[in-house]
Structures are given as structure tokens and as C-alpha cells.
Swiss-Prot record:
Oxidative deamination of D-amino acids. SUPFAM superfamilies: FAD-linked reductases, C-terminal domain, FAD/NAD(P)-binding domain. The lineage of its organism: Bacteria, Pseudomonadati, Pseudomonadota, Gammaproteobacteria, Moraxellales. One of its GO terms (cellular component) is cytoplasm. This is D-amino acid dehydrogenase. GO terms for biological process: D-alanine catabolic process. GO terms for molecular function: D-amino-acid dehydrogenase activity. Pathway: Amino-acid degradation; D-alanine degradation; NH(3) and pyruvate from D-alanine: step 1/1. Keywords: FAD, Flavoprotein, Oxidoreductase.
Length: 421
């Protein structure tokens, strides 16, 4: 079976790898010069199934209003003049209730836990290296109210069988020794020992090389113009004015998937949520993290690679604007220097990317009303966490194999206005 995968971020490359491993003849098309050159390039580096939590949660509307008046707020809303932005925010607000939160959380955890299992198996099979560590994730609380509020998440972790440890301020240094210097600023933390870290860019490029050895044909610097439709099927994809054909097509264009599908009357509810990161060379390992630390107050992740610290976070609703906002850099620097001042901030590189976010925070993985068109997008901040599981899942769906986990609630069908079959 011939399959064309559109997109070479971590989701597209993982999809291509698993398809090829199961015998498909795969071609990957991308406008960039290589894999992982956009959203997968500089993400926070955490692989955190236990923190797979919907952004649309009870209390978020109130918090969003409060954040509008804070200098170092984790969320910023800049109206881009589009009706779509307002519609997407309205859809998200509809999910900010306990019932929707529970449903969405289960779907996200299902994919994320499966994905971690797939990653571990892939690592065992290939020996792939991406500066990975398996030392868990530590969520830090600066306020007692945060320690109390985390009980809701703990109950979900227990239901899902996720290992955790609730720590007081004096115990944080046992997990992250450098935090002994910041103990007076913190009240405690939640440690998930089974989470992992790694450089998504290194991983995606290494996996692309492995996929090439399996026969995957990567075509970069391609202007992917449109899909050619005939009835309920895709007959080809127009690239640089020429038509390429396959038996099946997988769309993994991230935030750009929605506009690409507009001519097909598939209304994909994916909005670009802008995030930022700093990559900082380490000069004093004693003041650097061992794994990933999440600052609950500022919603920022600080992750250890081999000789670098990756600091990622923020959420900005401003359309497809890729400008670098120095105020966001100041927030990332402030949090890092407050907790882990072991990096050379003058040598830090500042980056931004667009996360493809759905209103319910759950990715869109599965079939469409077109018999041979499949979607793998909408992973939001969890593309790295969910990549391998999503790739394996979509490969099984495309090839009509039995899936390892339930696909209930993952396809575009859950959005009735999307005309999905």
C-alpha cells in the first residue's frame, strides 16, 4: 500500500515510521528543509503522560481574566480579527466543566500512556538516542492553595494507575538537588517518577533516518498546494504544480492542517497556540535540573538535556504570528534564574512555535468522510508526549489493523459540524 504523509514534524515522522515498519510504501512531504523544523524544533522536552491535562478545565475562565492583568501571566490573548479565533475560544469555554474535563482527560491519558509504552519499545528496538532521561517530572507549588488543588489530579492519577509522590518543601531536594537553594520559595511538589525527557528535534531527525532505512522517501522543500478530490476519495496531492498519488493520505500539518482542509469543507477545530522556549548552555551543573520541573504558578517547564537547559511555556492566542516577544523571554528567564541559575543566560537561544490545539485538548486521530484521508493533528502542548502512540495508532487505522487501544472519541467525528463520517 502506498501512503503519503503530509508533514515531517514529530507526528508526521512517527506516522511514517510505523507505517513503513508495517510494510507500507511511504512518502513524506514537507515545505521545510528537514524534519522537525517548526513546532517540534524547540519544545519544552518533556514526555509527561501523567500531566496530560486539558486546558479546558473548571475555573480556567476566571483564571484567564485574572491573568490578563498579570505581567508574567502564562496566558495572553491577542485578538487576531478572525471570527474563527472567537469561535474556537467559545468551544473551549464549553469544555470548562467537570464532566467534559473528565472525558477529555481520559482520552488524553489513554493516548499519552500508550505513547510512552510505544516509545520505550521503539527505544529498545532501535537504540535511538536523543539526550533522553527517565527521571520523572516534578511539579512545583509556590502556594498552599496549589497543593490543595492538586488533589483532584491525584484522584485521576490513582484511577489511571499512575505512580506519584506528593512532597513537602523539605523533600524536593531529594528529587532535584539544586532546589535545596530555592526551598524557601516553595511549599511542595508532585513527583511522577515514570515520566521522561528528551530533545524532540534530535529524536525526530534520528527517527527519520531510521525510517529512511525502512524505505521511507522524504521530500523536503516542497510546496504542498492542495488535495485533489473526486467524490468521497482523495485522488492525489498537488505539489509544485505536479500531482502525486497514493492509496491513502495522512495529514500531519499541525496548526496548518485546518486551512489546508478548508477547500474540502472539513472544518477542523485546530487553532495555533503560540509557545516560547529558551535553550541555555549549562555552566554549573550543581544549579541545573536533573529532569523536568514544572512551575505551576507560571506554567513553565524547565528540562535538562545533556549540557543544556530547555525552558518552555506560555500560551499566546495571536493567530499565526511568529514574532518573538521579549516580555515572554523575560518571564522564562525570571523563572529559570529563580530556580536553576546554572545556565549561561547570555548564550541562550530564544524560539517560538505554534502548537496545534483543539478546544477540548484531545488530538484528532483517525478517519474522515473521505475514504482514504486520515488525520493526525491537534496534539497541542503534548505532541512530543503523544507522538509515538499517535503514529502507531494512525498506522493501524490506515492499514485496517486492530488497534492496541480504543479509538473512541479521538477522531474528527466528535465535532459534529465537521461533517465526518
Amino acid at each position: 500500500m502506498r501512503v503519503i504523509v503530509l508533514g515531517s514534524g514529530v507526528i508526521g515522522v512517527a506516522s511514517a515510521y510505523y507505517l513503513a515498519r508495517q510494510g507500507a510504501e511511504v512518502t513524506v512531504l514537507d515545505r521545510q528543509s528537514g524534519p522537525a523544523e517548526e513546532t517540534s524544533f524547540g519544545n519544552a522536552g518533556q514526555i509527561s503522560p501523567g500531566y496530560s491535562t486539558p486546558w479546558a478545565a473548571p475555573g480556567i475562565p476566571f483564571k484567564a481574566v485574572k491573568w490578563m492583568f498579570q505581567h508574567h501571566a502564562p496566558l495572553a490573548i491577542n485578538l487576531d480579527g478572525s471570527m474563527w479565533q472567537l469561535q474556537w475560544m467559545a468551544q473551549m469555554l464549553k469544555n470548562c466543566n467537570p464532566q467534559s474535563y473528565a472525558v477529555n482527560k481520559e482520552r488524553m491519558m489513554r493516548v499519552a500512556e500508550y505513547s510512552r509504552d510505544c516509545l520505550r519499545e521503539l527505544r529498545k528496538d532501535t537504540g535511538i538516542h536523543y539526550e533522553n532521561r527517565a527521571k520523572g517530572t516534578l511539579q512545583l507549588f509556590r502556594k498552599e492553595a496549589q497543593m490543595e488543588a492538586v488533589q483532584r489530579d491525584i484522584s485521576v492519577l490513582e484511577e489511571c494507575g499512575v505512580s506519584y509522590e506528593l512532597l513537602n518543601a523539605n523533600e524536593l531536594g531529594r528529587v532535584e538537588p539544586a532546589l535545596a537553594n530555592a526551598q524557601d520559595k516553595l511549599v511542595g511538589g508532585l513527583h511522577l517518577p515514570n515520566d521522561e525527557t528528551g530533545d524532540c528535534y534530535l529524536f525526530t531527525n534520528a527517527l527519520a533516518q531510521i525510517a529512511k532505512e525502512l524505505g521511507v522517501n522524504f521530500q523536503f522543500n516542497q510546496n504542498v498546494e492542495k488535495l485533489i478530490v473526486e467524490g468521497d476519495q482523495i485522488k492525489g496531492v498537488q505539489v509544485n504544480g505536479k500531482i502525486l498519488t497514493a492509496d491513502r493520505y495522512v495529514l500531519a500539518f499541525g496548526s496548518y492542517s485546518r486551512d489546508f482542509l478548508k477547500p474540502l469543507d472539513l472544518q477542523l477545530p485546530v487553532y495555533p497556540v503560540k509557545g516560547y522556549s529558551l535553550t541555555i548552555p549549562i555552566v554549573d551543573p550543581a544549579f541545573a535540573p536533573q529532569s523536568t520541573v514544572l512551575d505551576e504558578t507560571y506554567k513553565i517547564a524547565i528540562t535538562r538535556f545533556d549540557q543544556r537547559i530547555r525552558v518552555g511555556g506560555m500560551a499566546e492566542l495571536s493567530g499565526f504570528n511568529l514574532g518573538l516577544n521579549e516580555d515572554r523571554r523575560a518571564t522564562l528567564q525570571m523563572v529559570t534564574q529563580d530556580l536553576f541559575p546554572g545556565g549561561d543566560m547570555e548564550q541562550a537561544s530564544f524560539w517560538t512555535g505554534l502548537r496545534p490545539m483543539t478546544p477540548d485538548s484531545t488530538p484528532i486521530i483517525g478517519a474522515t468522510r473521505f475514504k482514504n484521508l486520515f488525520l493526525n493533528t491537534g496534539h497541542g502542548t503534548l505532541g512530543w508526549t503523544m507522538a509515538c502512540g499517535s503514529g502507531k495508532l494512525i498506522s493501524d487505522i490506515v492499514l485496517n489493523h486492530k488497534t492496541d487501544i480504543s479509538t473512541d472519541g479521538l477522531s474528527i467525528q466528535r465535532y459534529s459540524h465537521a461533517h465526518a463520517a
